[in-house]
Amino acid sequence: MSLAQFLAEYEPHVHITAFVLGSARLSVFFMTAPFFGNAVAGMVVRSAVVLALYLIVHPMVLASVAPLMPAEGGGWVLLVALLLKEIFLGFVLGWLAGLAFWAVESAGLFIDNQRGASQASLSDPLSGDQSSPTGAFMLQSTCYAFFASGAFAAMLGLIYSTYECWPVGELLPSALFTKPGAALFFGERMAGLAALTVLISAPIVLACLFADAALGLVNRFAPQLNVYVISMPVKCGVASFLLLFYFAVLMTDAAERFAAFGIDLATFRAFIP
């Protein structure tokens, strides 16, 4: 079938409705996920990317939405409900995909707080929000590893699979909002985010704590030495030295953290039969 025949098979308003409903999931996903922040690409660039990625699934979305047309009377209520469902799914998918990135950024914030550089804040180029120097550096490095390693293509395949599991033309079952395990699932992901943040930052934070303990002993036996003045340079030096070796390990383990999105998505699918 040629492109002209495909476009002529349905009325223009059917194509437009399918595009609005189908692209909402991808649009909200990219707005929520931190690796495609507002400061990296503007609205025009993001819209072009979403359009290019959406066209792959447009025939599938069109086949799901076309039976709902023409929308007469209460039909528009159904379309609005479907749009809200797509926004909800896009937000959940973007939130699950961003957990690994937010954990790395929070770990960098913990490290800066422990080494005494918590007041050194800057605007993160990816998200546009305020962040610490180490947090912004670790987040950007993780994003570079995410795209360079091919993890983005794998994640995009998982996003495309959701259009088959949860068709655009169907509402979510009420079981998602009535099952107690659904709320527990999101709580566990938040707990996992906090645990991963502590785990990533633990080596550098512990080294800074040991440096504080050593400086405390120095202050005990040499009270005339102003330990407060030298504590921050010492801890910054220790943290920077350890980051030279720890950064390679952090980037090597990034693939495992990226793969967690597939595991979380499979768990979330169990709540929506």
Task: Please report, for each region that a protein language model flagged, where it lies by residue.
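Hydrophobic alpha-helical segments and their helix-loop boundaries in membrane
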Residues: 1-273
